[in-house]
Regions:
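C-terminal helical cap(s) of enzyme catalytic domains, especially alpha/beta-barrels
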Residues: 1-8, 98, 149-164
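Conserved anion-binding
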Residues: 1-75
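Hydrophobic faces of well-ordered beta-strands that scaffold small-molecule active sites
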Residues: 56-60, 81-83, 123-127, 142-147
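Active-site-proximal loop/turn and secondary-structure-junction residues that shape catalytic pockets
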Residues: 60-64, 87-89, 130-132, 150
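Glycine-rich phosphate-binding active-site loops on the catalytic face of alpha/beta enzymes
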Residues: 81-91, 141-161
Length: 164
C-alpha cells in the first residue's frame, strides 16, 4: 500500500487503497526521463500493475523474519525475496557465517526462504559466482547477484539474451 498511489487499482489484491502521496513525482519524473503524468503510471508495483516498473523485494535476514517468511512473501505485490546470510547468522549467534560453507541451521534457513518463494510464485535472489551459477539456476534462483561473467554464463545456460 505504501508504494502505490491512491488511484492505483487495488480490488482483488488483498490490499487497501494506496497511500503514496503527491509532490515528489516532478523530480522523480526528471530522473526517470519522463513527464510527471507518465511517472505516476509507471512508478507502480509490478506485477500488480503489468506496466509498473517498480519491483518490491524482501530481505529475510534474521530468525524473526524467517519465522514469518511464508506470510511475508505471500503479500500481494512482492516480486522477490532474498536471504541475508550475514545478519541471519548473527541472529543465530554465528557472527562470522556470511560466506559458504554454511552450518546446517543456515542451510535450513536458506532452504526455507527458497521454498517459500517458490510456493508464492515469486523470484528468489541469491549471490551467484561463475563456478556455481548453473547450479543456482537449477535449484530455483531467479535473480542472481554477482559478477558480469556469472551473468553472461547464466544467460548462455538459460539461452536468454539481453534486449540491447
Amino acid at each position: 500500500e505504501a508504494a502505490r498511489y491512491p488511484f492505483a487499482p487495488y480490488s482483488g489484491t488483498g490490499l487497501e487503497q494506496g497511500r503514496r502521496g503527491s509532490g515528489g513525482q516532478g523530480i522523480a519524473a526528471q530522473v526517470w526521463g519522463m513527464t510527471p503524468v507518465e511517472y505516476l503510471h509507471k512508478a507502480d508495483v509490478w506485477p500488480l500493475n503489468p506496466k509498473g516498473e517498480i519491483l518490491l523485494g524482501l530481505k529475510i535476514e534474521n530468525h524473526r523474519a524467517l519465522a514469518n517468511v511464508e506470510a511475508s512473501v505471500s503479500v500481494s505485490g512482492i516480486g522477490f525475496a532474498e536471504w541475508g546470510p550475514g545478519d541471519m547468522g548473527m541472529s543465530f549467534g554465528l557472527p562470522d557465517n556470511h560466506d559458504e560453507p554454511f552450518p546446517k541451521i543456515m542451510e535450513e534457513a536458506r532452504s526455507r526462504i527458497l521454498a517459500a518463494t517458490k510456493h508464492a510464485g515469486i523470484a528468489f535472489l541469491n549471490t551467484v559466482r561463475v563456478d556455481d551459477v548453473e547450479m543456482r539456476i537449477d535449484e530455483g534462483v531467479k535473480i542472481g547477484a554477482g559478477p558480469e561473467a556469472a551473468a553472461e554464463k547464466g544467460r548462455r545456460y538459460t539461452k536468454r539474451t539481453m534486449p540491447w
